[in-house]
């Protein structure tokens, strides 16, 4: 599974760390030292199956551990099938609703298939944290909890916000970072990879591993994919590109991405060289040709998730349900988030129906019509829904 030789090329290691990490604990220098030591490190990345899809944000960490695997290190993909039933409180202003065993099992059915689109299965092994967490006794849990104080937990921003707004905090929410932290102990980990929203949880694991095993775990905090709102890209904002999205849907979503995000996505979520990226957008500068950059970025993501043949397929009009007029049709197709925005595009002459610019909100649409937006999104009405 893992190569017999550990690659210790300092320049290559620095480039890997530069591209996708934001912070490293205990330090960048220590990480470089260990990666250049010639020793095989056991490094893991964990995903809780709280939903059925792995998305663009996950690929940052997956591409990072892929690079570490290619250096010869032992990579573990940890499926948090036990922790998913509790729910990570990170970033939540209310407690997560616990998931059932059945829901978690359903969510993770295609996880390995999705992950293998990014990192070949021969470069990592899989573990599930129910293997050790489900066997813990109440005595074990009390011992685990004794390593941290309530004060250490409630300093977290989300808990402070709930206290301020008089919203409840469940005791089980304090246990989540302890359980995630114990994963490192159970697997005797040398390093953990996660987004910066997971920093607290990963540092809990670092402290627990030091106390239980006397090991000083490396924590690789990756850069986060920030959406147009300035916050972490989220499903609720409709910005998430899932690895299971159809080729045309991936293209539609990429074409709607804010121009300011293009370089970041190319850096974090593809394996394209910096030379390729710089040719399209220099760091700190606007894209040279935003539309062309989006088209090429869409091609690359489709290629990564669905293969070369799907790239041509993604350029075809996406078949979708439409309405009886142009406004309701582009709204139903997901080209715009609201009726007002749909009307704006029509007023601007940014919508074509069958090759003709339409400036009438009430312009009738029918099955078979091809509608194109100024962003290059193209749909074919397969079925008319009259509401």
Regions found by a protein language model. Give the residues of each.
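Positively charged, low-complexity intrinsically disordered leader regions
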Residues: 1-43
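N-terminal catalytic cores of NTP/NDP-binding nucleotidyl/phosphoryl-transfer enzymes
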Residues: 27-88, 193-199
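Short, hydrophobic/aliphatic alpha-helical segments
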Residues: 38-46, 75, 176-186, 290-294
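Short, conserved acidic/polar surface loops in the N-terminal third of protein domains
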Residues: 86-91, 137-139
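A charged helix-plus-loop insertion that forms the helical arch/lid used to bind
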Residues: 89-105
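Short, hinge-like loop/turn segments at secondary-structure boundaries
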Residues: 92-97, 143-146, 236-237
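Divalent-metal (Mg2+/Mn2+/Ca2+)-assisted nucleotide/phosphate chemistry catalytic cores
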Residues: 100-221, 227
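Conserved nucleotide- and phosphate/pyrophosphate-binding catalytic cores
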Residues: 200, 208-387
